[in-house]
Regions:
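In a subset of proteins, long, contiguous C-terminal domains/tails are tracked
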Residues: 451-501
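Conserved, well-ordered alpha-helix/loop/beta-strand core segments that scaffold catalytic motifs
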Residues: 187, 191-220
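Outer-envelope exported proteins of Gram-negative bacteria
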Residues: 46, 211-213, 217, 291, ...
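Surface-exposed amphipathic alpha-helices with a cationic face
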Residues: 36, 198-206, 331, 355-356
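Alpha-amylase-like alpha-glycosidases and glucanotransferases acting on alpha-linked glucans and related
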Residues: 11, 17, 55-191, 195, ...
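Catalytic domains of carbohydrate-active enzymes, especially glycoside hydrolases
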Residues: 26-51, 288-289
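Mature N-terminal, pre-catalytic/accessory segment of carbohydrate-active enzymes
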Residues: 1-26, 38
Length: 501
């Protein structure tokens, strides 16, 4: 039987600090120390890939390249690439609890440019950069070139580029490489900064017994290096434009469905190539994570396909995905891997069978359990091979969710959880998942801190105001630490060496 364990869900961007956004610096190391101190096993984060307009980590210019916002300036200073005066006194935003992405976009760039320029004076770092480039030829040159060209077009999306370079014609690419050498080097070296800092942080966490649960979106963005260099992997027209886009059909929560806009995969082409790109993508993910959550798992059994010109997601069609064949190929190439399947939303018998056949643990969200007396998300219906959550980045925090319930529904929740007089409703919910039979129990940081609805990370199908929440260092009191450690040990979820998911 697998070892019971627990962890915290909080993205890097939500860490406290002085740079307007959470980074790989001191606060990240202190967060690892907190996880160790409270006997946790997992730190779950959102995708680390570079973000685009809307700031969502699920819409990236690359399926591999890292988010430059997470690079820590103090660590660059310790490496001799920056002076403290290069970043101290810079305005990164006045609100310590919210990220101002537009401000950061303009404030961080000149500082990173200075660090990139200073690498030219450090021979040992230049050797490390050269080694990094040699080890990442499968994605790094294309990414750096793509971003440099995008910048030269005023950051316009791929479909607004000149036709020759949009189609990746060799002569055009050679011309842009010659013209944009400095910009290409910037995007190359900053990836070196990103991966050096992240892998050092991950090593520190692993040495403390903390494993990183990463996140892989099912789809890539239509404005991405993959769409540019591998258009044949998607359903496209003769101009390399997507014929269809992804989303979810209408339901009780979204009467017009969810129109995500990502290009749809040509699964027939992937199969012809033995799913080599997927094997590669998963392999790259496990270079930076210990465990991998795969988003929208249902999309591998059936996916909702919407015409590219549609204004909403109502009139799509269900199309067949690759099914278990894809995951058998991944297992054949990479062995058994610790993967979590995000099986939320509309799940039919076919999707359930795919989850069962894969053997991956699915997710249970306690907020989804009420007020349905028969819900499979009620803890007494959990199975051991599952991951229990109070909520995720797409849910309201417990306090915000609870406030929206009717008085009768609130009473039902309190009675089911047998809420004690000395407990908040959030603490009762955390106890509910920790005491369940699920092998793994994950609490959002907002819920551990008993935050209100203003700390919600994301409202799906909305633009603006998302992905901004940050904790304050003083939020994490000794009382909160003691509560988490006590609950973790009471329900036999304390960390042990060689824990496996």
């Amino acid at each position: 039987m697998k070892k019971r364990s627990s962890g915290i869900l909080m993205h890097i961007t939500s860490l406290p600090g002085d740079f307007g956004i959470g980074t790989f610096g001191k606060s990240a190391y202190e967060f690892v120390d907190f996880l160790e101190e409270t006997d946790q096993t997992y730190w779950q984060i959102l995708p680390l890939t570079t973000t685009s307009y809307g700031d969502s980590p699920y819409q990236s210019f690359s399926a591999v390249a890292g988010n430059l916002n997470l690079i820590d300036f103090e660590l660059l200073s310790e490496s001799g690439l920056l002076e403290k005066g290069d970043y101290e006194g810079v305005n990164f935003g006045d609100n310590k609890e919210k990220v101002d992405y537009e401000l950061l976009f303009n404030a961080r760039r000149p500082i990173l440019e200075k660090a990139v320029e200073n690498t030219k004076q450090n021979s040992s770092i230049l050797e490390e950069i050269e080694k990094f480039e040699q080890e990442n030829t499968s994605w790094l040159p294309d990414y750096a070139e793509y971003m440099a060209i995008k910048e030269s077009f005023g950051y316009q999306s791929l479909n607004h580029w000149d036709e020759d370079i949009k189609r990746g014609e060799q002569q055009a690419r050679e011309r842009y490489r010659a013209e944009l050498k400095d910009s290409i080097r910037y995007y190359t070296v900053t990836q070196y900064f990103f991966f050096k800092q992240w892998l050092e942080l991950k090593k520190y966490a692993n040495e403390k017994g903390i494993k990183i649960i990463g996140d892989m979106p099912i789809y890539v963005s239509g404005d991405s290096v993959e769409m540019w260099t591998m258009p044949e992997l998607f359903k496209i027209d003769e101009s390399n434009e997507p014929l269809y886009v992804a989303g979810c059909p209408a339901d009780d929560f979204s009467p017009t469905g969810q129109l995500w806009g990502n290009p749809i995969y040509d699964w027939k082409k992937h199969k012809e190539q033995n799913y080599s790109w997927w094997v590669y993508r998963v392999q790259e993910s496990f270079k930076i994570y210990d465990v991998l959550r795969i988003d929208h798992f249902k999309g591998f059994s059936d996916f909702w396909q919407i015409d590219r010109d549609a204004e909403d997601a109502v009139n799509g069609t269900w199309e067949e995905g690759p099914g278990i064949e894809l995951f058998e190929k991944i297992k054949e190439q990479l062995g058994d891997l610790p993967i979590i399947a995000e099986n939320l939303g509309f799940i039919d018998a076919k999707a359930e069978k795919l989850l069962d056949d894969s053997g991956y643990p699915g997710m249970k969200i306690l907020q989804f359990a009420f007020p349905d007396h028969d819900s499979l998300d009620l803890p007494h219906n959990y199975t051991a091979n599952s991951v229990a959550y109070t909520g995720t980045h797409d849910n309201d925090v417990v306090n915000g969710w609870y406030e929206k319930l009717s008085e009768d529904e609130q009473k039902l929740v309190a009675e089911y959880l047998n809420q004690r007089d000395d407990e908040t409703i959030t603490q009762a919910m955390i106890r509910g998942i920790h005491s369940s039979v699920s092998d793994y129990s994950i609490v959002t940081m907002q819920d551990l801190l008993d935050k209100d609805a203003s700390s919600r990370m994301n409202v799906p199908s909305t633009v603006g105001g998302n992905w901004e929440w940050r904790m304050l260092a003083e939020d994490l009191t000794e009382e909160k630490k003691e509560f988490l450690k006590d609950l973790t040990n009471r329900y036999a979820r304390e960390r042990e060496e060689n824990d496996e998911i």
